[in-house]
């Protein structure tokens, strides 16, 4: 059997064994994809005992390519929410998440200095303690750039594997301790979150307003205060018994009924100007108007602004809502269309069909993936990751590497959405498949390389001490941030649990938090808010640690 065939066969065995281990559950908590690492350690141990060696170049390529696939697809997935999570609504959550990452770095650096822990070991323990695999890859890359011994990869892998189990358990323990210390009642916390969420964030609302203000009589819609700010869409106008689709130059009269869509505060402003709210139905039933939902799939309209399509003027159709990645937006004339946008159209059936032909609405395209943008993104990411950044006071250049470069490029490209006929939308099923393949390949190689000396290190070497270091890196930041967020951040417990799970990029912990109150979305919302920024920080932090500690700073 050739070296390549042998390597692929062994890694397949590792993947099968590891995924099987990952499916085991103890009280609802399991290793998940992390089981592949331990499958690799088991196979690597017996391969070492049998003096079976695999081709190093093949293993290295598979490891790096798997890491690239994983971080790129993560970036594509979280990119649309990354930049919005940095705005004011997520500043507090992201601030606490960044504090947790910084505290972990401080604890790791302190352990390195106090106990003279080898740099590869403390970086591996740091990555395992926070259950973050891309962090491990970034650390291995920067050590190679700094000229560390090739054996450091194995040391990092062993440190990661030793610290990983408590990294998963430690966050669950922290959630339990915070709940016990503050005597928290889950149902009350869920109700508190729902009340707060109702005041601070809401989906789009609708209202029917009768025009009673004589000063508005004869004005065009675009001339009405508050309607010209693009915060509210008028999707229907009823005059007498006639229901019509209004245009920006449509003139209103006293007694007209307007059906408006927008956020609650914006609708209230329009109500104060126009007249009074009425309960009369402006349903399209029994009329020649229809309401349809269509999906943007036509490459020719991607990136174009709604005003450029001139849908109102040409087709007498109103876009009343726009749903992008699950978030409802008020579609303004300045809104650019992206692949996968869901549009709410109001108009006559033939006109809606004409607009549908313009925007696409080909459902099959949502299940297809353009491969060209994938490799363009990966190529650009690798190039970006190879560019050295020289910072004052640092003894070595900082690089994003194969873990950070593709991630940053993916975040940017997914935010842009499309360039010409190229779009970076990736069907969720395809994204998940590539992401899982990538992380399985990476963990399989890391585990296999670590397996030869893992058992000896754990039993006869410094394994127990490494485990204690990992416990400190896991628990200290979690407990500090958990208490601060509760006491000073006035954060609800379920939101706090999502914050802690997201800060550790730990899906099992999120599943545990969701299980406390299955009907509340508080934990999932805070997890998704901090996840993009934390993933970026987790990739950058081991590189900064490695450079600073390498120079003895």
UniProtKB/Swiss-Prot annotation:
Annotated RCK C-terminal domain residues: 191-276, 279-361
Annotated GO biological process: potassium ion transport
InterPro entries listed in its UniProt record: AAE_transporter (IPR050144), RCK_C (IPR006037), RCK_C_sf (IPR036721), Transpt_YidE_put (IPR023018), YidE_YbjL (IPR006512)
Transmembrane segments: 4-24, 29-49, 65-85, 95-115, 158-178, 371-391, 403-425, 439-459, 465-485, 493-513, 533-553
Entries under Gene3D superfamilies matching the protein: Regulator of K+ conductance, C-terminal domain
Membrane topology: Multi-pass membrane protein
Family stated for the protein in its record: Belongs to the AAE transporter (TC 2.A.81) family. YidE subfamily.
Domain of life the protein comes from: Bacteria
Keyword Membrane: yes
HAMAP family in alphabetical order: YidE
Keyword Cell membrane listed: yes
Keywords recorded for this protein, A-Z: Cell membrane, Membrane, Repeat, Transmembrane, Transmembrane helix, Transport
The protein, known as: Putative transport protein ASA_0825
GO MF assignments: monoatomic cation transmembrane transporter activity
Subcellular location: Cell membrane
Family annotation (SUPFAM superfamilies): TrkA C-terminal domain-like
Gene Ontology cellular-component annotations: plasma membrane
